Amino acid sequence: VSGIPTVGYSLEHPLGLIPGTGRDFLAQLLYGSRISFLVALFTTMTALTIGLFVGIIGGYFRGRIDNYLGRTTDFLLAFPAFFMIVALSEPMVRRIEGTGIAQGNAARILFLIFFLSFFGWPGFSRLIRSQVLSIREREYVTAAQAMGASRTRIILKELLPNLWAPVIVVASLSLPGYLAAEAVYSYLGIGVQPPASTWGILLSNATRYVTVMPSFFLIAAGSLVIVVLAFNLFGDALRDALDPRADR
């Protein structure tokens, strides 16, 4: 296979050089993680904010509002989000570029954050709603209602402070999922494009040399697996710390 650099592993290049380009693999791995984490972090924050708002409204007010929001949530959860993102990637990126909001890879990053958040918030909403339905029946909420506290005050003073623990836990468990999703879409050519670097692009390049230089693919894939696993373990530990009754 042509394009494989002759310089191997060394103190100067601990993970070697990228085939075809001769770039330092460790530097590209670290640099590419910035975009992957950027997409994952902003997607988690956006989806969580929308899900928190919808879940609180539906769980607290119930009735027709909850029924309408619940049907919308069920529809989006059943929707084939992956195929929709694949199908809309090119036309939507061109539309974003046409509006002047962002250009090139910035437009692709914005597209991924928007659509991953759009299809991601229903999962957060369902969890928050179930928590709100439980909290609103507790004595301190009933006491606040009996004292004439407004709905806004009850939501801000009684509900939100008791939702932070599950919110933090679900956010820590969701972030690695979006990190992996960004890698998958970049691998498929939907996300950020070369010469920029993300873990998905590194994996895509590595598959071309997997038979002659398997270490390139194994290091790229292993790095993603380790980071995702680390966040999942952190989320599990955080859940056990914030809610010891979860294992009972």
Where are these regions (language model features)?
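Short, conserved catalytic or interaction motifs in soluble domains
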Residues: R62-G63, L77, A81, R94, ...
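Glycine-rich helix-loop "coupling/hinge" segments at transmembrane-helix boundaries
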Residues: L88-M92, G104, L116, L173-S223, ...
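Membrane-spanning helices that line or support transport/gating and their immediate boundary helices
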Residues: L52, I56, Y60, R64-R71, ...
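Amphipathic cytosolic juxtamembrane alpha-helices at the membrane-cytosol interface
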Residues: R23-L38, F42, R62-G70, L133-E137, ...
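Alpha-helical transmembrane segments
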Residues: S117, W121, S125, S174, ...
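Generic hydrophobic transmembrane alpha-helix motif, especially the helices
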Residues: E12-P19, F42, T46-I50, G59-Y60, ...
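Transmembrane helix-loop junction
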Residues: I56-Y60, E90-R94, S130, S134, ...
